[in-house]
Amino acid sequence: MSSRRSSRGSISEEEINELISKLQSLLPNSRRRGSSQASTTKLLKETCNYIKSLHREVDDLSDRLSDLMATMDHNSPGAEIIRSILRS
């Protein structure tokens, strides 16, 4: 990637477009857009919102797991399965 950088060390427009395209491919339900500034801004906002939703989902799953573990016998086979999953 550094071979495509200009002598100033900045990122080329081509590299930015490639990175935007890669980012877009990581988002669920992402549609093809033009390379305009408005589309890039919208894509970055969607990315931030998606990351926030993933954080909320992780927090929710963590809470649910904590609740489940609190109600289980810590020596039960189910508790051991959960511990082994968390270790992996």
Swiss-Prot record:
PROSITE patterns: BHLH
GO cellular component, one term: cytoplasm
Keywords associated with the record: Brassinosteroid signaling pathway, Cytoplasm, Growth regulation, Nucleus, Transcription, Transcription regulation
Name of this chain's protein: Transcription factor ILI5
A Pfam family annotated for this UniProt entry: bHLH_ILI
Database matches in InterPro entries: bHLH_dom, HLH_DNA-bd_sf, PRE
One annotated GO molecular function: protein homodimerization activity
